[in-house]
């Protein structure tokens, strides 16, 4: 069943309790054996999905009323989708074409793909497919991007606790998409901060998915307007929705990795409003 999240404005958000904030923006329990776990956000109509095939070959539309939720005859009739495997070895079949995904490999599936299935090579070490889908009006090319083939951009420094590598997968410099962009940021041991100085992008929303968070550790994800911030305490393999008006930054009790996904008006990465760190409140 689709979990529907409606849009929230920044004025109402200021009055949210901790419980309300988590219910509105946090996505938990994405990986359930042989199930499709979908969350539909009305912010730019992005859908976040988790699939963990264990004993079955799992279809993308399993348990989803496609007409009720999308008004189409199949999931990707008017959508594109990007996914990462954050588990064991797995296979994705798209309209009869097989794609092998290892750990941290990425697959972009273009608009119009009708039949998409998932399976794991080893039920004892199942694949975990984390994916985000955005509306699309045109088709490009379904493509597998291995972690080794991602565009890599080292940033930050140990002195500022944010030494990291940004891996660009579904990105204009790597392949063409309708509006979806996705990548993976890996923090080095000893670094804990991401996306600081913080920013917003008025014409795009973003979803963060935190993983490789060690046991008994958490990430404090910062959100809200720069002048009135809030936080959500997040555990391993959880995602969080970030509306266009909200910052999206985080600090962990250890280093970690996160996948970012964006959709909206454009794919211009410099179309953002940076907030000086000393001006945050």
Label the model's feature ranges.
Residues 1-48:
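Non-cleavable N-terminal signal-anchor transmembrane helices
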Residues 28-69, 163-206:
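A short glycine-rich, His/Asp/Glu-containing loop-to-beta-strand
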Residues 40, 44, 176-239, 243-247, ...:
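Acidic/His-leaning functional-site neighborhoods
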Residues 53-54, 89, 215, 247, ...:
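Short, glycine-/Ser/Thr-/acidic-enriched flexible segments
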Residues 75-102, 211-236:
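A short beta-strand-loop-beta hairpin characteristic of the jelly-roll/cupin
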Residues 87-126, 132-135:
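Acidic, low-complexity central loop/insert segments
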Residues 101-121, 233-254, 263:
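Conserved metal-binding segment of the jelly-roll/cupin
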Residues 123-164, 224, 259-281:
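Double-stranded beta-helix
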């Amino acid at each position: 069943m689709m979990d529907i999240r409606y849009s929230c404005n920044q004025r109402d958000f200021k009055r949210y309790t901790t419980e309300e904030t988590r219910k509105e923006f946090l996505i938990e329990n994405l990986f359930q054996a042989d199930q499709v776990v979908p969350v539909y956000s009305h912010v730019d109509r992005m859908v976040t999905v988790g699939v963990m095939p264990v004993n079955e070959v799992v279809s993308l539309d399993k348990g989803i009323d496609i007409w009720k939720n999308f008004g189409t005859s199949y999931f990707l009739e008017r959508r594109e989708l990007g996914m990462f495997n954050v588990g064991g070895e797995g296979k994705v079949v798209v309209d009869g074409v097989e794609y092998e995904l290892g750990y941290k490999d990425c697959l972009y599936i273009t608009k119009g793909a009708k039949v998409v299935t998932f399976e794991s090579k080893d039920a004892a070490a199942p694949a975990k497919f984390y994916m985000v889908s955005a509306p699309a009006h045109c088709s490009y090319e379904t493509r597998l991007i291995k972690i080794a083939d991602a565009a890599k951009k080292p940033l930050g420094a140990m002195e500022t606790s944010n030494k990291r590598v940004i891996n660009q997968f579904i990105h204009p410099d790597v392949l063409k998409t309708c509006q979806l962009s996705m990548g993976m940021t890996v923090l080095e041991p000893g670094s804990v901060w991401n996306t600081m100085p913080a920013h917003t992008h008025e014409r795009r929303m973003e979803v963060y998915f935190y993983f490789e968070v060690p046991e008994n550790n958490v990430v404090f994800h910062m959100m809200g307007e720069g002048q009135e911030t809030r936080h959500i305490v997040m555990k391993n393999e959880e995602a969080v929705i970030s509306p266009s008006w909200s910052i999206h930054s985080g600090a962990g009790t250890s280093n970690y990795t996160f996948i970012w996904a964006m959709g909206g008006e454009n794919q211009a990465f410099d179309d953002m409003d940076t907030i000086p760190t000393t001006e945050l409140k």
